[in-house]
């Protein structure tokens, strides 16, 4: 193999992500697919549901932490995905869409959780010697409190049609915020300045 050919192989390899990162690529696609699925339930929002709209206090203070979590962003992805799936698996619900559509949403979330878990496990294998940071623990706890407020709202409203309409909109909003944070982190991590700081 000539030196020139070796140089080309090295250059191509530099821009091809490792195989394990494919789980994370698929995860980004799944999040966007679920944003669309959840958005499809927003058509025809009943006026009678407006009185039940609640501020679930999404913890915006965690966003600066997330935007700097190069090594832990996938653990946060798994946390959000699994908590969202737990909400949509609650029993005794009155879904705001047809049962078939509801199953599509749950199936989409299950796929997102599975991919988030695989992505997270890939990351853990690579960083076994690095314990989770205090920032990660803060994000982990705040997300737990946020989804608990959503669950409590559903319970108090007896899983009503309006409650589910509102919760679906909220979780979609959460996914959009998080998806933007992932994209921003990716842009930052791929910048020459960031790479230089890691050296």
Swiss-Prot record:
Major site of localization recorded for this protein: secreted
Q: What are the boundaries of the signal sequence? A: 1-21
Q: Which domain of life is it from?
A: Eukaryota
What GO molecular function annotation could you give as one example from this UniProt entry?
cytokine receptor binding
Q: What does the miscellaneous comment read?
A: Transgenic mice overexpressing IFNK in the pancreas, develop insulin-dependent (type I) diabete.
Please give the tissue specificity annotation from the record for this chain.
Expressed at low levels in peritoneal macrophages.
The protein's UniProt keywords, in alphabetical order, are: Antiviral defense, Cytokine, Disulfide bond, Secreted, Signal
Give an example GO cellular component term for this record.
Answer: extracellular space
Q: What induces it?
A: Upon exposure to double-stranded RNA and interferon-gamma.
UniProt entry tagged with the keyword Mitochondrion: no
Instruction: Please give the biological process terms from Gene Ontology that the record holds.
Output: defense response to virus
Protein family: Belongs to the alpha/beta interferon family.
Where in the cell does this protein reside?
A: Secreted
Q: Which InterPro entries match?
A: 4_helix_cytokine-like_core (IPR009079), Interferon_alpha/beta/delta (IPR000471)
Q: Which Gene3D superfamilies does the entry mention? A: 1.20.1250.10
Q: Which SUPFAM superfamilies match?
A: 4-helical cytokines
SMART domains, A to Z? IFabd (SM00076)
Show the disulfide pairing.
Answer: 24-119, 49-162
What job does the chain carry out?
Answer: May play a role in the regulation of immune cell function.
* Gene name as annotated: Ifnk
Q: What is this protein called?
A: Interferon kappa
| PROSITE patterns tied to this protein | INTERFERON_A_B_D
């Amino acid at each position: 193999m000539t030196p020139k050919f070796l140089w080309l192989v090295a250059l191509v390899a530099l821009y091809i992500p490792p195989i394990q990162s494919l789980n994370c690529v698929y995860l980004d696609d799944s999040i966007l697919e679920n944003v669309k699925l959840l958005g499809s339930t927003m058509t025809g929002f009943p006026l009678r549901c407006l009185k039940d709209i609640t501020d679930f206090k999404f913890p915006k203070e965690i966003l600066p932490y997330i935007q700097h979590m190069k090594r832990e962003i996938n653990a946060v992805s798994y946390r959000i995905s699994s908590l969202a799936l737990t909400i949509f698996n609650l029993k005794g619900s009155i879904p705001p869409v047809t049962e078939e559509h509801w199953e599509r949403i749950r199936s989409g979330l299950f796929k997102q959780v599975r991919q988030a878990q695989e992505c997270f496990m890939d990351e853990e294998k690579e960083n076994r010697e690095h314990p989770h940071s205090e920032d990660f623990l803060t994000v982990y706890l705040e997300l737990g409190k946020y989804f608990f407020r959503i669950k409590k709202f559903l319970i108090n409203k007896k899983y009503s049609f309006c409650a589910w309409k509102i919760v679906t909109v909220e979780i979609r909003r959460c996914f959009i915020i998080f998806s933007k944070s992932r994209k921003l982190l990716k842009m930052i991590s791929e910048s020459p300045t960031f790479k230089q700081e890691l050296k």
